[in-house]
Swiss-Prot record:
Belongs to the class-I aminoacyl-tRNA synthetase family. Glutamate--tRNA ligase type 1 subfamily. Keywords: Aminoacyl-tRNA synthetase, ATP-binding, Cytoplasm, Ligase, Nucleotide-binding, Protein biosynthesis. One of its GO terms (cellular component) is cytosol. This is Glutamate--tRNA ligase. SUPFAM superfamilies: An anticodon-binding domain of class I aminoacyl-tRNA synthetases, Nucleotidylyl transferase. It catalyses: tRNA(Glu) + L-glutamate + ATP = L-glutamyl-tRNA(Glu) + AMP + diphosphate. Catalyzes the attachment of glutamate to tRNA(Glu) in a two-step reaction: glutamate is first activated by ATP to form Glu-AMP and then transferred to the acceptor end of tRNA(Glu). A motif ('KMSKS' region) lies at residues 236-240. It is an enzyme of class 6 (ligase). Monomer. The lineage of its organism: Bacteria, Pseudomonadati, Pseudomonadota, Gammaproteobacteria, Legionellales. One of its GO terms (biological process) is glutamyl-tRNA aminoacylation. Its main location: cytoplasm. A motif ('HIGH' region) lies at residues 9-19.
Amino acid sequence: MTVRTRFAPSPTGFLHVGGVRTALFSWLYAKHHNGQFILRIEDTDRERSTQESVQAILDGMAWLGLNFDEGPYYQTERYARYQQVAQQLLEEGKAYRCQCSKERLEALREAQLAAKEKPRYDGHCRNQSLPDSGIPYVIRFRNPDGGIVSFHDEVYGDIHVDNSELDDLILVRSDGHPTYNFAVVIDDWDMKITHVIRGDDHINNTPRQINLFKALDAPVPVFAHLPMILGEDGKRLSKRHGAVSVLQFKELGVLPHALLNYLVRLGWSHGDQEIFSVQEMITSFDLKNVSRGVSSFNYDKLYWLNQHYQKSDSPESVANALQWHFEQAGIDLNQGPDLKDLVAVQAERCKSLAEMCQISQYFYTDTIEYNEDAVKKHLRPVVLEPLMVLHERLKALDEWKNDKIQECINDVSLQFDLNLGKIAQPLRVAVTGSGTSPSIDMTLALLGKNKSIKRLEDALEKIRARASVV
């Protein structure tokens, strides 16, 4: 048997991290078993489905590298198939037309609630054999009267539901559109899905779907339902917790494989291992180690993983991802150091690519913004003479290399009997605008000689101006 899994999002909003984890687990299970992963867009909600959401799903999957073997399939392109199967079920007596009005159904619901009963359809039209007479109707599934629906969930174990708890669900609405529970069964059947891995909010749908599979003499897939992801406050993950859309994490500067590594550990474990390459995930993943407990999304842990990959990945690969952030900021990368050289010195200083871009822009701009507090603290008249001497020493360098730069700084600090920091910090503020940067020799080396000398000259003018005011 070829394992076939699917990811079936609805394009009614952004691609949520909970959906991404579902996609990841389905993708990993298929890859682990040398199977196939299918993408299906469940776009039957005509009012809420948008092309923008479809594109966000496709872009998010592409960014994460969750490639699909088939698809994307669209439910709106399969309406004829749903109608065909609905007609087949009608002809076989496994479904029936229901002409109950909204008013009758609402009155039934209110009466059941008043009697403290579970609201459910009472089968009023079940045995009436109503013809297609032009009166609006829905098509309902004739759920078995007795017996128990039993299935083994790969996460939650054996589940049993009495058919008396299930009413006759609607398959096709009066406007001809299929319901979710009907369309998803036909799709999984036609697409030969062997394993349905999805959120545990679908557990209650499963007995109904199993009955429908059996009515169609279709093979019933294996089910695995994944527990919910919560925020750290124990509430359902939402925008108030921070980024929840996969593409927001890209904007925040999270590497795609760092996000995958983090998500795979939300509800799944492989011993005590925390760090997984994508290939290690594929090799190790199984469903038996998926936890039944809910998971909490911890942003600090995600950024810890992200920084790990920033440091352990090759500078070239990190630079490729970092380039997008500079492009979004409108920074011309031709005006500064090679990105891979920047990554080599900044990766361990930043928790994300967005932060790395933000604190490194001075390497690529002609002018810099000075932090006024840093200027007041470090660009004082007392450092004017040492910086003037350092300016001449640096300007005279034939080789603009770290060791030569550091040698100049050391010599000037000795000449003026100053602690090294008393020279390095004013120099840092002069060339970066702030009091934080990589080591000062590395900072100047990356900036290049011309830009470093020009900024030092500008800072000297700033100090002279302050001195004249004083």
